[in-house]
Swiss-Prot record:
UniProt cofactor(s): Mg(2+)
EC number: 5.4.2.10
Name this polypeptide is given: Phosphoglucosamine mutase
NCBIfam families with a match to the protein in the record: glmM (TIGR01455), PRK10887.1 (NF008139)
Role this protein plays: Catalyzes the conversion of glucosamine-6-phosphate to glucosamine-1-phosphate.
Superkingdom, natural source: Bacteria
Listed GO MF terms: magnesium ion binding; phosphoglucosamine mutase activity; phosphomannomutase activity
Reaction equation(s) it catalyzes: alpha-D-glucosamine 1-phosphate = D-glucosamine 6-phosphate
GO BP annotations listed: carbohydrate metabolic process; peptidoglycan biosynthetic process; UDP-N-acetylglucosamine biosynthetic process
GO cellular component, one term: cytosol
Phosphoserine modifications at: S102
Length: 445
């Protein structure tokens, strides 16, 4: 199949005003997408965005392009990425468009598409859109132009959808929860969801100004929520990223619960209820501790390449339901078509209530192994992944680690860097082994 030139594995993304992220290209992209999508039955598209100041710019450009191609546009304003996927289905739109750069700083932005069923757009459709980009922009006749409307009740619809994943017979009454919205798209959603389910909510990262998304808050910057959980004597914390598709949690002692441990909680809960279908999909970066803990429960575990798109591919291939990344992308296909941080948090809270257990108790039997990642630059045409010196160092370390350790070597896709990841039982040894392999890479001539 022809390779995509414009779309990456998760749409397009970059610095605003440079490369692909310009208003000119957004206008043309809206038109090209409209041309392709108009070949199907439903002539309407939903657009949502996060809280970056540039969201207004790209929203206007996309809606103009789509209208010029004859498609109606429904604007839902700042909304989490999974909300766009859900609302695309419920409004029976032909596609959903998200304007977001997820966990990146405010000066980046991105554009990605959902199909009418709320899943990522097929590669074939993205290739069709790319083909239209090469053509001159032409406008449909005036009477065929698309209409643009704003949907005022989108937030309320999504709040009710999220609450629907929590058992009706349960309540969060008595729980004090810190919710970090990363000054992002969940700022007006997540606190309301958990409050309406009965919890006492302390919200942080809930005052976006267009420039502070993901700035020292959210799932990629856990310091503030850990401090707040301890200072407020809260039962737990839930941290989301800028577009709401990732989650990290914090227990009452201020310890971070990452995506691997969340996957473990959900898999164990599903197994106990007799609803676990198959096993769990992680990634190459998933901690070996998750693998070993699931083995102890006879739950199959497989690894995909890094990226929620690849996790989804393996889930579909195996016909399994639960998968995700240690970074907090959690997929549960019984509860949605894409990663949803709020829903994943609700499912963990439901497991706590069902089992009358704390986060500490639910994670007591999974021991995360020390993991060290070293980025090392290599020069010239030497490929460290085929170097006998590097491979010998890797084999030596693997022999020393045995079954209780793992070595992963990955090249960066954008610069001459090798990522050396080593995990095992002892922090000191793991650190030494990672630098031993990194030195072998540096010694390549």
């Amino acid at each position: 199949m022809k390779q995509r030139q414009f779309f990456g594995t998760d749409g397009i993304r970059g610095k605003v005003g440079a490369g692909k992220m310009t208003p000119e290209l957004a206008l043309k992209l809206g038109w090209a997408a409209g041309r392709v999508l108009s070949r199907s039955g439903t002539q309407k598209v939903i657009i949502g965005k996060d809280t970056r100041i540039s969201g207004y710019l790209f929203e206007s450009a996309l809606e103009a392009g789509l209208s010029a191609a004859g498609l109606d546009v429904m604007l839902i304003g700042p909304m989490p990425t999974p909300a766009v996927a859900y609302l695309t289905r419920t409004f029976r739109a032909e596609a959903g468009i998200v304007i977001s750069a997820s966990h990146n700083p405010y000066y980046d932005n991105g554009i990605k598409f959902f199909a009418n069923d709320g899943s990522k757009l097929d590669d074939e459709v993205e290739l069709e859109i790319e083909a239209e980009l090469d053509k001159p922009l032409t406008c449909v006749e005036s009477h065929e132009l698309g209409k643009v409307v704003r949907i005022d009740d989108a937030a309320g619809r999504y709040i009710e959808y999220c609450k629907g994943h929590f058992p009706a017979e349960q309540t969060l009454s008595g729980l004090k929860i810190v919710v970090d919205c990363a000054h992002g798209a969940t700022y007006h959603i997540a606190p309301s969801v958990f409050k309406e389910l009965g919890a006492e909510v302390i919200a942080i990262g809930d005052k976006p100004n267009g420039l502070n998304i993901n700035d020292k808050v959210g799932a990629t910057s856990m310091g503030q929520i850990c401090e707040t959980v301890l200072a407020e004597n809260a039962d737990l914390g839930i941290a989301l990223d800028g577009d709401g598709d990732r989650i990290m949690m914090v227990n009452r002692h201020g310890r971070v619960i990452d995506g691997d441990e969340i996957l473990y909680i959900l898999a164990c809960d599903a197994q106990k209820r007799g609803v676990l279908r198959g096993g769990v999909v992680g990634t190459l970066m998933s901690n070996l501790g998750l693998d070993l803990a699931l083995q102890a429960l006879d739950i199959p575990f497989v690894r995909s390449k890094v990226g929620d798109r690849y996790v989804m591919e393996l889930l579909k291939e195996h016909d399994w339901r639960i998968g995700g990344e240690n970074s907090g992308h959690i997929l549960n296909l019984d509860h949605g078509t894409t990663g949803d941080g709020i829903v994943a948090g609700i499912l963990v809270l439901a497991a706590m209530q069902r089992q009358n257990a704390t986060l500490e108790e639910l994670t007591a039997d999974i021991k995360m192994l020390p993991q060290v990642l070293v980025n090392v630059r290599f020069e010239g045409d030497n490929d460290p992944l085929v170097s006998e010196i590097v491979l010998a160092a890797k084999a030596e370390v693997e022999q020393k680690l045995g079954a209780r350790g793992r070595v992963l070597l990955r090249k960066s896709g954008t610069e001459p860097l090798l990522r050396v990841m080593v995990e095992g039982d002892e922090q000191e040894a793991v650190t030494e082994y990672a630098h031993y392999i990194a030195d072998a890479v540096r010694n390549l001539v």
